[in-house]
């Protein structure tokens, strides 16, 4: 198969451009000079807390020029002065203590335009009802709280500011002794800066979808695992994860991640009016492949006889051509509570009482470590009707983002593009984990693991910013035409030369290690429009749960680039080459067809190991340890 190597910018050309030598690598792919839009990290706030979820969901408030950050490690909301994005500064916190019981956990937040902060708070015992907490963005004063459903995991304020909508996930107890009901709470907000009364809370349940109810649950909505709640087993099994509200503020769309479905909520009546399954992704089709092994020593993205369960975490809504479309980040998630474990490696099927792969399955001959053997798959799906063997394998997540109609029709899926982008941008750390730098550490699980997203409008273009939780970074797509999105750029404010977990485990100071490592584990993203930004240009803010950092990116559109801070040279460091851009495709296929990024990416199914070693040799010759174009952030 013809394998085309990406062009490399010569070291001499980099020197001619005057790029200073640097010590921390901020990946910019493709070369910024060839991108219509690039993300440039300009400032970071560090907590110094490693792998403690010290920076998760973020929200920017224009009137105060403040950024609000969920810090699950401290149980507080950190408040940053973001009036100078190059030097975000902690100026205070919002605490639930004194209003809610000790041990309550902050999970999510949203800020209304007038400064009403709304935070989703989980109870100290997670199977008890939680709360929405309200505060003033200017004074940081807590205004009050109302009780909502069990384990509110995400909250969103409607575009018109009238409602707060919380996804009450209601996970089982850690030992699976209790499995409470999932629900969605709809809270009518006061028009002024005040907490609503408890009477303003309405909760949409799933009771009508139970056996004997007025609605029938579609067959492909995944209901599985121990049935602990015998009164409302479907309601207990459904786990609302993330909420988006349409532009008219009339309908909420809620991901049911483990169930691989989306719930539709009518906000006027606070009722669930529809649940539609997302179906499954055929990884056996060209352009929809995956790299399933962390033990083959090569980047091998190819079609495989596996179905992917989309299982999105984040979801966003936008309008195009007079219609509303939904965008999902297809992370994937397996259930594991108490003695129940949903996942197993393919090579372990047939052991310890687990049914084997059916002998007539195409996967039966692919159980070696270099094939499908290492891939984690679901034990809840794919069994033959008699329970004797697995006739189909289902892996977790889509390793992609998707665009859907509001009726659940798939309009676009990025196929294997995200893995191919990462393979070309950071070949020596392809599918790395977040806590440590490695090669293919996550190929056997969910690959780059797209977790969340933000949608932003710049001029007449609409962009999706998709965070990759494991390898890190943000992928940008132009989604103005929902049927024909195109890849724009990828930025990763991470230095792979710093393996954070390894250094900290051997005595490294976490604060120092994390400053050098950069951003690990992007969890929350917020787009700041130019008219709201302190710089007058768009910004993107990311909360990174593993590094505990909050980073501000300048969103540079071609012709109006915002310069970043001056680079800081490191001892003996040398500049490294950047990778040339893939040209965005000109789609000609039907809307639901998956396409590769461009002709410059290696062909689907190609073994990329010769290319990877060639690329690695060039980078190592540059003295950079395999890192790409670098720009050091000032702390």
Residues of each region from the PLM?
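Bacterial N-terminal signal peptides that target proteins for export
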Residues: 1-10
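Basic polycationic patches enriched in arginine
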Residues: 4, 595-596, 634
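Bacterial N-terminal signal peptides
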Residues: 10-20
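Signal peptide processing junction and immediate N-terminal pro/mature segment
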Residues: 22-28, 610
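Beta-sheet-rich non-transmembrane sensory/scaffold domains
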Residues: 26-571
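C-terminal low-complexity, Ser/Thr- and acidic/Pro-rich disordered "stalk" regions positioned immediately N-terminal
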Residues: 559-606
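C-terminal membrane-anchoring or membrane-association module
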Residues: 610-635
